[in-house]
Amino acid sequence: MGSGSQQKSEKLRSKPPFSEMENFHAQYEMLGTIGHGGSTKVKLARHRLTGTHVAVKMIPKREYWCKPLMSEAELLMMADHPNIISLLQVIETKKKVYLIMELCEGKSLYQHIRNAGYLQEDEARALFKQLLSAINYCRNQGIVHRDLKPDNIMVEKDGRVKIIDFGLGIQVKPGQKLNLFCGTYPFSAPEVLLSRPYDGPKIDVWTLGVVLYFMVTGKIPFDAASIEKLRKQIVAGKYSVPCRLSVKLHHLITLLMTDNPELRPTVAEVMMHPWVTKGSGVFPDPCEEQIPLKPDPAIVKAMGHIGFQAQDIEDSLRQRKFNETMASYCLLKKQLLKECDRPIRAQPMNPSVTPFPSLVDTPTFHLGLRRRETEPTSLRLSANRQMSVCGRSTSKKRDRSFSWPGVLSRPINITPTMDQTHTCTRSVPCINSNFCIIHPNSSDESTEGHTSASAEDKPVRSRGWPRGIKGWTSKIGNAMRKLCCCIPSNETSHLGQRRVSPKK
């Protein structure tokens, strides 16, 4: 891990947690649930200003939760890679923390493989190289995911891979050993199942091997009717490889799933393997900015018409504040890029809709969507602020389970078929007596999500916003579209009409 990221991590811990409350519903409209993860939920929401769909992870704040060294939000704040899900904004209320993230328009790798049966080596290579690039970036940042699996890997329509759900992630120093045992059983490395201190990056390498095996065979390498048999298989490293696989691929899988972590290669070494570099050794550019440090003047001008200040936009991006301004800029930029990539075609005009104003038509912007000076702005959460949040990804439905004393709990029904394995292989949160005190009256809070919404979660009108917010949403959408020369001025937006896949 570089000194820069270490200093950034120290800043994250040194700052006090943010204290201001901000109403989530003033900025986002809830559309439905797209994923569950134990106590957390992932919601589909619409950004009111831009009309763009986003994914919102809702994390309850509970006193008896495990308190990890770094929260999922802090890890995502550190990450800026094209193959890692982008965090846009963080909003905290008295009971919950909202992580607003980009929405992947595609399928999980599990569903992608389920539909295809298995992938040919060329397609598997293209996806796997993106995974390697992302995990190598994480290694350089000192981040360990600890729960890589097909459910936590999204494949977008253009073939781009996105790693999601860093709920079990952690930041480590070079050579640091970990003792908290967590993850998904069939994807766990032998040293984890043996309850030994382990090297974080090496368990991600093992899991990459299991994921690659799944991609090219359509099944996981280890299957058994009981946890004990499954554990023995993984510890012994016993699995079969179809003879149709190439020699180089067979060799790579064997390297990745080396039972001795000392002999297991690093991600950088895997990236140099002949099977990986076949055809083209080009990897996704880790320097490709997902969140730009310098704003586009045209977007700044458009945002200025609706009340945003240019200096505030620049500061929010440069300091990565993850506030309303930063989220609005990133979503507007994404919307603009999407419109520019769309083929030019005439669209029928709706006679009942007033034509959108353009940026050059300045008189039409004098009633822009401006905020009052007294209105609380987005939470000023910069990349050096701390959150005491512990997001975890577990199953929506729980099977009978057994517990490792003081360590972790895992499902007991592990069966050979892919569907049943997918149902039973769920993530397990870190449970350690040193970090977690179980509240005896947790049942009341566990049912909180099934009762009526609390007052703070009910939609309220945004203060300082004029009536007709839908009209202004359309205005800013068209204003951004005017910035792209390849889009006709009379084209209507189709944002939100694409089918999206849930993320866990």
Curated annotation (Swiss-Prot):
Annotated EC: 2.7.11.1
Family: Belongs to the protein kinase superfamily. CAMK Ser/Thr protein kinase family. Smok subfamily.
Tissue expression per record: Testis-specific. Expressed in the testis from 22 days postpartum (22 dpp).
Keywords: ATP-binding, Kinase, Nucleotide-binding, Serine/threonine-protein kinase, Transferase
All residue ranges annotated as the UBA domain in the record: 294-334
InterPro entries reported for this sequence: Kinase-like_dom_sf, Prot_kinase_dom, Ser/Thr_kinase_AS
Record's protein name: Sperm motility kinase 2A
Organism: Mus musculus (Mouse)
Active site: 147 (proton acceptor)
Something else known: Encoded on the T-complex, a region of 20-30 Mb on proximal third of mouse chromosome 17. Naturally occurring variant forms of the T-complex, known as complete t-haplotypes, are found in wild mouse populations. The t-haplotypes contain at least four nonoverlapping inversions that suppress recombination with the wild-type chromosome, and lock into strong linkage disequilibrium loci affecting normal transmission of the chromosome, male gametogenesis and embryonic development.
Residues of the Protein kinase domain: 28-276
Gene Ontology terms for molecular function: ATP binding; protein serine kinase activity; protein serine/threonine kinase activity
Segments for region (Disordered): 376-403, 443-469
Annotated function: May play a role in sperm motility, especially in the regulation of flagellar function.
Recorded catalytic activity of this chain's protein: L-seryl-[protein] + ATP = O-phospho-L-seryl-[protein] + ADP + H(+); L-threonyl-[protein] + ATP = O-phospho-L-threonyl-[protein] + ADP + H(+)
Keyword Metal-binding attached: no
Entries under CDD domains matching the protein: STKc_AMPK-like, UBA_MARK_Par1
